[in-house]
């Protein structure tokens, strides 16, 4: 940097010559950019602060800071090497078709990026964010780095690029694989954060797209911004906040939110809540961390649910009846043992054998694709939290308690027109105060989205106003109950399914199976 140049933008951010900026301003910059995340303590009245970390990098007389923070604090730079660089034009044509609303959003984002160079697109689950981002990249015709944080998302993005553009060879940057001389390159954020690749690899990328960009506020991922930047930066996500208060990191590096639309309310969705009471009081009771009654041990309590035999049987009854109804089912759990158990029981049964697949971390992409074709998919919350795109799903079962379920429910909301009501099965474990509290959070979301909530009460023993857990006729009856369609607009969202329902050939005789413990 020449001695008389105070500021400039490079691929490493907004660079400031400290010798030409007053000490007080430098002090303010360092203070602003030493960020301290908040950690929510669910059982105390205040937030608990974690240790802070810097977003600036010092190198002798120079300090590198986030680009958009630099714009706000110091104004336009003296030199912008990133914008003035002559990026090679790529042969990139979008061959797919955007829906009218997606086209409107794309045009808005393109205009915003032409004016400011970057920003964030926030749209709900199933709205087509990935296709919109690919379309935008093709419009700019610059080599594009698409950053993801999960392997199955990497493969999903590659498939989308190949099926919706003329680009049939997509590069990959991951671990030791560095294949970057293609119009589109997909990279894992973990590799970018941990490995110091040769800087020359990134110089011709005119656009960087970061999927599920809300994760980039995390300390370990935010270091990626200090290594790479480009003329155009686009973040896409269904989220626009972080509970630790670190979303500002994303805006400082990526730019402002250019378009925001939350998940649209959908009166077609039916939530069937089963308020479940168990007789296994030892397994359902509250557990605490180190005996501190202010810190419930949620992890231990969720694990204990797996060992309640009748609760597992009840879930099996639900799955078999939904299968009988011809539903395409996504069962989600926070415990792999529960997934393994259900997979074994269902896949070893002559009637559901071959119709069950797992969808969990560590599986090969070929196995995930095979599982995605099954009528019953048993998956982890982690795999379904973001980006999971399986066509035809119309039922999601929340097998273990969870507070934030927007992404999980979004897996069955990927259509504009529905052949039938999407169904959420929500099991509320009424004998545990922590689980009941989580249920209230889910209810707030369901009500906000105008879902139709139907409540049923199930018990493992005779109890007033409760039905018995193994009353299969009752389960069958309540699963087919649907609310009245409230208005013509909602009626227009549903059309008659001409295909007859698949007939389930017989029940799983789980009463003869001796698995897990009982009370």
UniProtKB/Swiss-Prot annotation:
* GO molecular function list: ATP binding; ATP hydrolysis activity; DNA binding; RNA helicase activity
Q: Which reaction does it catalyse?
A: ATP + H2O = ADP + phosphate + H(+)
Name of the protein: Putative ATP-dependent RNA helicase L396
Concerning SMART domains, the annotation shows: DEXDc
Start and end residues of each Helicase ATP-binding domain: 110-258
SUPFAM superfamilies annotated for this entry? P-loop containing nucleoside triphosphate hydrolases
Q: Where is this motif: DEAH box?
A: 211-214
Family annotation (InterPro entries): ATP-dep_DNA_Helicase, Helicase/UvrB_N, Helicase_ATP-bd, P-loop_NTPase
Q: Which PROSITE patterns does the UniProt record give?
A: HELICASE_ATP_BIND_1, HELICASE_CTER
What PANTHER family would the database entry show?
A: GENERAL TRANSCRIPTION AND DNA REPAIR FACTOR IIH HELICASE SUBUNIT XPB, RAD25/XP-B DNA REPAIR HELICASE
Q: Where is the Helicase C-terminal domain?
A: 317-457
Q: Where ATP is bound, by residue? A: 123-130
Q: Which organism is it from?
A: Acanthamoeba polyphaga mimivirus (APMV)
| EC number, as in UniProt | 3.6.4.13
Task: Give the UniProt family note.
Answer: Belongs to the DEAD box helicase family. DEAH subfamily.
Q: Which UniProt keywords apply?
A: ATP-binding, Helicase, Hydrolase, Nucleotide-binding
């Amino acid at each position: 940097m020449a001695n008389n140049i105070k500021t400039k933008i490079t691929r490493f951010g907004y660079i400031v010559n400290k010798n030409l900026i007053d000490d007080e301003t430098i002090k303010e910059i360092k203070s602003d950019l030493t960020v301290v995340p908040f950690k929510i303590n669910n059982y105390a009245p205040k937030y608990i602060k974690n240790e802070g970390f810097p977003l600036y990098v010092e190198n002798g007389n120079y300090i590198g800071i986030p680009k958009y923070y630099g714009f706000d604090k110091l104004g336009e730079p003296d030199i912008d090497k990133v914008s003035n660089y002559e990026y090679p034009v790529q042969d990139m044509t979008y061959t797919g078709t955007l829906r009218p609303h997606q086209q409107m959003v794309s045009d808005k984002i393109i205009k915003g990026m032409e004016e400011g160079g970057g920003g964030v697109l926030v749209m709900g689950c199933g709205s087509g964010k990935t296709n919109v981002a690919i379309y935008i990249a093709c419009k700019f015709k610059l080599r594009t780095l698409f950053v993801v944080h999960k392997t199955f998302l990497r493969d999903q993005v590659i498939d989308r690029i190949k099926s919706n553009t003329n680009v049939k060879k997509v590069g990959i940057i991951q671990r030791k694989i560095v294949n970057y001389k293609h119009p589109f390159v997909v990279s894992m954020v973990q590799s970018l954060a941990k490995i110091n690749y040769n800087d020359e690899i990134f110089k011709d990328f005119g656009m960087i797209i970061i999927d599920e960009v809300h994760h980039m506020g995390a300390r370990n991922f935010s270091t990626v911004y200090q290594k790479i930047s480009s003329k155009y930066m686009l973040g896409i996500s269904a989220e626009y906040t972080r509970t630790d208060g670190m979303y500002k990191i994303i805006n400082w590096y990526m730019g402002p939110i250019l378009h925001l639309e939350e998940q649209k309310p959908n009166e077609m969705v039916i939530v069937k809540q089963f308020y479940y009471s168990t007789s296994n009081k030892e397994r359902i009771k509250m557990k605490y961390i180190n005996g501190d009654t202010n810190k419930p041990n949620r992890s231990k309590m969720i694990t204990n649910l797996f060992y309640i035999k009748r609760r597992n049987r009840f879930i099996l009854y639900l799955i078999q009846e939904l299968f009988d109804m011809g539903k395409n089912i996504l069962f989600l759990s926070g415990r792999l043992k529960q997934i393994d158990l259900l997979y074994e029981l269902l896949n070893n049964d002559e009637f559901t054998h071959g119709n069950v697949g797992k969808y969990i971390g560590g599986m090969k992409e070929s196995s995930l694709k095979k599982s995605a074709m099954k009528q019953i998919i048993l998956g982890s919350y982690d795999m379904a939290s973001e980006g999971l795109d399986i066509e035809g799903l119309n039922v999601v079962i929340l097998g273990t308690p969870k507070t934030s379920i927007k992404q999980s429910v979004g897996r069955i909301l990927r259509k504009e027109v529905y052949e039938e009501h999407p169904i959420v099965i929500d099991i509320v474990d009424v004998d545990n105060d922590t689980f009941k509290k989580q249920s209230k959070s889910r209810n707030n979301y369901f009500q906000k989205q105008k879902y139709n909530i139907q409540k049923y009460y199930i018990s493992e023993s005779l109890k007033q106003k409760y039905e018995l857990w193994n009353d299969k006729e009752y389960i069958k009856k309540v699963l087919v109950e649907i609310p009245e369609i409230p208005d013509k607009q909602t009626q227009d969202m549903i059309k008659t399914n001409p295909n007859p329902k698949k007939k389930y050939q017989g029940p799983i005789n789980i009463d003869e199976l001796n698995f897990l413990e009982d009370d």
